[in-house]
Amino acid sequence: MDIVFTSGDTFKEGIGISKGLMKRDLISMLDVKEDLEEIIDRGIDIKRKAKSGMSIEQLKGKTLGMIFEKSSTRTRVSFEVAMEKLGGHALFLSKNDIQLGRGETIEDTALVLSRYVDTIMYRAMSHKAMRELAKYATVPVISGLDDKEHPCQVITDLMTIKEHKGKHKGLNLVYIGDGGNNISHSYLLGCGIVGMNIRIVSPRKYWPDSYYVNEAKKFGINVEITDKIEGATKDADVVATDTWVSMGDESKKEQRLKDFQGYTVNDKLMKNAKPDAIFLHCLPAYYNYEVTKDVAHGKQSVIFDEAENRMWAQIAVMVTFMK
């Protein structure tokens, strides 16, 4: 039978999106405020099933395009292995592999990739670029990090907390370090959504953007921003930190290391937390700067569970957004 195309036909507006349906992006924690707990529970359930030998191939025939403007260990490996376990395929694209790195517009890149892949994962230099790609892509866009937020990491951390604590609501999370980075911002929103109280402990010049503080407070949780490290971990159920020098801040490394002196998570701070408190770090860790190795590899640390859960949490995200 001959196939006849009419003038009204379009080819692959977005191969993962049926015509008439709204696509869904994960750019901010606020994008999952209605179903965050459901996604976390899905990740825990899929992890359990996979480890018991059950198939989790829920995305057969699906392709994830991964754009990396920043280097990565965990983000790349976790997304690639996740797609393999789901029965799909992941395509790695560094900025040097595609024309985006040579001046092609984000708009054209988004429109073209939307014709080839079912979802785009973007690890971006800027939140502005992330928003622009999502604006023009006709398939879902999942953030692998930008300069303002890191939603996949905080979904991972909340999954890890639930595995170890059994709940979120009413717990106290203390984040020590760079309060103005993407992890801190996403913690504020994520804790708000699940009902955890949060204390950000950071030098004043590195406090979070007021937008994220105000959004977190709208959820009715206790939000404290302080530069006082003494007693900072009192009543903490979770203690978290991150590198003092994020990618893109290398030119400011010397000044940052001076500014953050005294904010190292050490045994004393962990002993001042609750006896069953856990320690989180998204890695890579720089020992004796943001955390001592004794803490990072100590009995309260769950950082390697956390690292593994990047894969399971992202599996849950992709099943939610791509299936």
Task: Indicate where each model-derived feature is located.
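Phosphate/diphosphate ligand-binding glycine-rich loop within oxidoreductases
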Residues: 51, 57-162, 287
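Short, structured coil segments at secondary-structure junctions
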Residues: 86, 116, 136-137, 194, ...
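Glycine-rich phosphate/diphosphate-binding loop of Rossmann-like nucleotide-binding domains
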Residues: 69-82, 165-241
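Rossmann-like adenosine-cofactor binding region
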Residues: 217-293
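Adenosine-phosphate binding glycine-rich loop
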Residues: 276-277, 282-323
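A short, gly/pro- and small-residue-rich
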Residues: 130-146, 251-273, 298-300
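Positively charged, low-complexity intrinsically disordered leader regions
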Residues: 3-77, 81
